[in-house]
Amino acid sequence: LMDQSTGYVLALSGGRGEKKTSRSFNRATQSTRQPGSVFKTIAVFLPALDSCGLSLASTKEDEPYTTPDGYQPFNTNANSYQGTTTIREAITYSMNVVTTKWLVEDVTPKLGIEYLENLGITTMDEDRDAYAPLGLGGISNGVTNLELTGAYAAIANGGVYTQPILYSKILDKDGNVLLDNVPEKHTAMKDSTAWLLTSAMEDVVSKGTGTPAQISNYGIAEAGKTGTTDDYKDLWFVGYTPYYTAGIWFGYDDSTLMRYRLGYNYNAHKVLWKNIMNEVLEGYEDRDFVMPSDVEKLRVCSTTGLLASYGCSTITEYFAKDTAPTEYCSRHSYRYYQDDDDASSSSSGNSSGNSSGSSSDNSSSNNSGDSSGGDNSGSNSGGDNSGDNSGSNS
């Protein structure tokens, strides 16, 4: 548990049970584990929004897919594909195939690794990790909970990475400073990128794979991301509020398959995160994530991500102003979407002028809920198990 604004680690647990030795193995700082879908946000969608000109409304087709080098990602339900999918939906429901597509076709694994290292992840190996499985958390050396939590804290802190520290200073008996542990800080992403990722990860908690992590005080905003590896060897939830960031890892040192230990309780790590945050935030004032001035809200076509025309199925989405669409969708109609007050002056273009799409937000979002999400990336990463139904394998 850390304060994202200062880098101070406020609480840390290195394991369960009685501590019997000094300087014993600390799983929070020393154990490197496969991160699963927790990597999707920071290895794929962070660089996609920050450097590749994409937006939360950018789309790809969720369909059977093979990368040029022969890698085949699958969603948790290998026979379930959702068709046209936005980046927001891919994050919310932890969708593997389209995430891999965005990494391979737009971001590139090399750029993903650069962003990870800029977020304080020290275990990356470019020669071994710069491949398609990176987007689903398939890496050679794993990652520590401390570093992963620190990476997400940068998103919570408006894009500014602050090195996690366990002490602030050391004084001698007279109060003189012997060691002043000032954390290293730098900008890791644009503030607009951080806010857009936060907005998408709020959906993870409100209706996606992270719903069991919803805290009791709904007046305090909350965002986060789930992660699961093959056969439930590792279960992750890393999330944050405007006050604090926390990361939870569940697993065994010997990678025992928790599929057979947890029964159907695949959400225990999310519930633990919620319980901890409920206690930590007791008595805190309601607070939301503050939207920066370089973000705007637009109504766009749910298929193309362009400004909506009358024939489009539409969604309302947030954009960084420098990547917001400026062209109108011409795929569905030539009649541009306008406010009702201006409708009478619109150019008719297509005489059939289907206007049924202009009056409501009829998006192409995944209505199947958590069943569309999850990880099943092959040898290194597994699936997200989501939602309030603890028996759901998604």
Regions found by a protein language model. Give the residues of each.
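Ser/Thr/Gly/Pro-rich low-complexity, disordered linker/stalk segments of secreted
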Residues: 331-394
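Short, structural beta-strand-to-alpha-helix junction motif
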Residues: 38, 84-88, 144
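Mid-domain, small-residue-enriched loop/turn segments at the edges of structured enzyme/sensor domains
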Residues: 73-75, 106-149
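Conserved catalytic neighborhood of penicillin-recognizing serine enzymes
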Residues: 53-112, 161, 173-203
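A penicillin-recognizing enzyme superfamily signal
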Residues: 1-3, 9-34, 141-332, 336
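Active-site SXXK
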Residues: 7, 34-60, 90, 151-155, ...
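Sec-exported extracytoplasmic/periplasmic mature domains
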Residues: 7, 44-53, 65, 92-96, ...
